[in-house]
Structure formats: C-alpha cells, structure tokens
Amino acid sequence: MMNPLIIKLGGVLLDSEEALERLFTALVNYRKEHQRPLVIVHGGGCLVDDLMKQLNLPVKKKDGLRVTPADQIDIITGALAGTANKTLLAWAKKHGIASVGLFLGDGDSVSVTPLDEELGHVGQAHPGSPKLINTLLENGFMPVISSIGVTDSGDLMNVNADQAATALAATLGADLILLSDVSGILDGKGQRIAEMTSAKAEQLIAQGIITDGMIVKVHAALDAARTLGRPVDIASWRHAEQLPALFNGVSIGTRILA
C-alpha cells in the first residue's frame, strides 16, 4: 500500500456547501487517477462557536486554543464527533466514496494526554496504533476522523485538529496537508509565502505578521514537518481545480520545511 495522505479540514469549510462540493469533487477526481489512500481529519471550530452562541455559553481561548470546561466537553464532542463528522460522511456518501467515521480513540489510533489544567478538557495528541486505520485503508475505505480523543483514564478531550492530524500522520507514516480558508501563509503585503522555515516563521511572529490562530497553525505545521521529517503543506480549499495537483504533491499554498 502506498503511504497515505492525510487531509486536515479546517476553517469555515464545514459551514459551506459550496466548499464541501468543491472538496469532494476534487477527492473524486483524485481517486479516479490515483491509488493513494486518503484519510480526512477534521475539527469544526465554527460549528462549535455557533452551538455555544445558541446555548449562550462563553467561548474562551488561551494562546489560540479553545478552553474546554468539564460542562462543555459533552457539547463539543457532540458537535465534532457527531454533527461535523456525520456531515462529512454524508457528503462522501453523496459522492460515492466509501467512508468510515471515527474519533481519535478508535483503535487507539491517536493517544491523548491532558495538555494544561487551565485549558480544561483539552488534549495533547501523540502517535498511537496504525492497525485499525490501515485495515480500513487496505479495504478501500476513507476514514473520516474527528479531533475528539480520550485519555487512558477515560476522559474525553478536545484536541487541536492540526495537532491531531500530525500525530496521526506520524502513526501512519503519512504525508500531511492542512486545508483552511487561507491560501497559505501571507506576508505583510498579503502575498503568499511559497516556503516557510522555522527561522522565517519566528521572524514573522516577532514582527506581528503571523498572529493568533495562524501562530498555532504554523507551529503545528512546523512540529509536523519536524516530527515527520518531511514537508507539510498549508493550502486553501477555495482553489478546487488545484486540489488534485496538491493531493499529488504539487505545492499550491505554503510548504513548511522542517
């Protein structure tokens, strides 16, 4: 089996039918021509924010990571492992892609430990067992995995989806693409930066050009590139016609080098 490709979905993609249609059309086109197995990892930040608003619950973040109190983890699990995951499975079904919905704890695919007491039920992802996912891939299924995990003591944890995808890529020896709303990392003039190193990233953070959630994303991508020992791509789902090329190794966004 060829080494798998993990596509991490983020941003407003889950909220946009147009975006999902573009993405799944690109997946179908890619699968027609390539044998490479695909795995989708997703969060669902926007979906969770909307749900919190409806329930009048405050959304607190610390260093770009969502604070998840004990009384909110069930709601967030429902949104991510439930609604977001099943929405993606429904789109896969509509496009004739055989898929299976999972969370990080299934088959111990990604192991999770608590990240920081102040963040509550927020987990740090670590490589786990490739057995279940490889079994699914060998049988032609596309796993669709939410970024909810579980600790060894049985506590549900909300995990940053970029970090979850990185841990899974390390588990499977897979390549990784982080798909989001932005076409990559932009410089001070709004131009796409084609390649990014650790030194360049720190410089742009110090200059205030990379801020907030993008800092978390860049650090996750740099960690991923270091952990995996190979480049990681950050790109946008908006350029649907370029996605099959991206899935085939052509950089259309920012390529993060270890």
From Swiss-Prot:
The record marks K8, K217 as: Transition state stabilizer. Keywords: Amino-acid biosynthesis, Arginine biosynthesis, ATP-binding, Cytoplasm, Kinase, Nucleotide-binding, Transferase. It is found in: Cytoplasm. GO terms for cellular component: cytoplasm. The keyword Transferase applies. NCBIfam families: argB (TIGR00761). Belongs to the acetylglutamate kinase family. ArgB subfamily. Catalyzes the ATP-dependent phosphorylation of N-acetyl-L-glutamate. This is Acetylglutamate kinase. The lineage of its organism: Bacteria, Pseudomonadati, Pseudomonadota, Gammaproteobacteria, Enterobacterales.
